[in-house]
């Protein structure tokens, strides 16, 4: 049983149906033996559970009559209508202001606890990951390149792409005239290079990286798809040290959140 919450809640709602009708229809799809009255009562309960104020009167409102944060709550209610064991949340805080983002993430955490439900969070926000997740998988070109406990990946990243992501995040405590970036561009999925998919952009790539595709290999408590991160790959090359330092500074700023 899987439920999904997508990036833009407005496009996930039918503009020609009230939110009450949409929820009722979805519940009846998952529970065909339920009466329409019971389904509507359950729809109201889901709106209340996800924090919609004055839920009774708002059942008959249209999607455009809700704020962005409220629409996201309604989409979460729709995702819960089938009583999922896994909730996939794809960038659930996109286009929301910071205070509303925090409320939505707290709602997802609360629902996961109360419903004993797993959550798969898809996001680029390292702060959200540090505050919310237990484990993190870093993906590049359609593959997992690093996976481990959140604190380990944030504080001790092993893959050059993870180092690059961490290093490219501006440090609010340090004044700088330029931003660190990862060289090059993401390859198309129909044109992934031989060897390691990241090697054209990697500052540490060597001949083996260009010819042999690395498997996920154990490195401490994590797994990393990198020859340099393998126990036989030796120390991280000097070319990656500046990314490491920037990544460490950012991880240090997240220490309290990750804890």
Task: For the regions a language model picked out, list residue spans one by one.
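ABC nucleotide-binding domain signature
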Residues: 2-7, 21, 118-120, 137, ...
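ABC-type ATPase nucleotide-binding domains, specifically the catalytic core motifs of the NBD
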Residues: 21-38, 48-52, 65, 148
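Hydrophobic anchor residue at the start of the ABC signature
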Residues: 23, 76, 100, 104
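Conserved ABC ATPase "signature" region
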Residues: 38-57, 166-167
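Short catalytic/signature loops enriched in Gly
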Residues: 53-56, 149-254
């Amino acid at each position: 049983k899987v439920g999904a919450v997508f990036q833009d809640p407005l496009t996930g709602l039918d503009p020609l149906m009230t939110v009450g009708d949409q929820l009722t229809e979805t519940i009846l799809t998952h529970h065909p033996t339920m009466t329409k009255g019971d389904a509507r009562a359950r729809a109201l309960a889901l709106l209340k559970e996800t924090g919609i104020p004055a839920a009774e009167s708002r059942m008959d409102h249209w999607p455009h009559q809700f704020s962005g944060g409220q629409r996201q709550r309604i989409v979460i209610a729709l995702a819960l209508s089938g009583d999922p064991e896994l909730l996939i949340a794809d960038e659930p805080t996109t286009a929301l202001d910071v205070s509303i983002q925090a409320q939505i993430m707290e709602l997802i955490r609360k629902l996961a606890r109360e419903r004993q439900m797993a959550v798969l969070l898809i996001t680029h926000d390292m702060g959200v990951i540090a505050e919310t997740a237990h484990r993190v998988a870093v993906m590049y070109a359609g593959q997992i390149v690093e996976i481990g406990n959140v604190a380990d990946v944030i504080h001790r990243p092993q893959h050059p792409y993870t180092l690059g992501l961490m290093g490219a995040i501006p440090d609010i405590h340090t004044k700088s005239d330029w931003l660190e970036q990862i060289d090059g561009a993401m390859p198309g999925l129909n044109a992934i290079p031989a060897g390691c998919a990241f090697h054209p952009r990697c500052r540490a790539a060597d001949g083996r990286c260009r010819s042999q595709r690395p498997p996920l290999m154990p490195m401490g408590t994590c797994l990393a798809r990198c020859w340099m991160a393998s126990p036989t790959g030796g120390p991280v090359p000097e070319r990656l040290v500046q990314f490491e330092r920037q990544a460490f500074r950012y991880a240090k700023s997240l220490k309290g959140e990750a804890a």
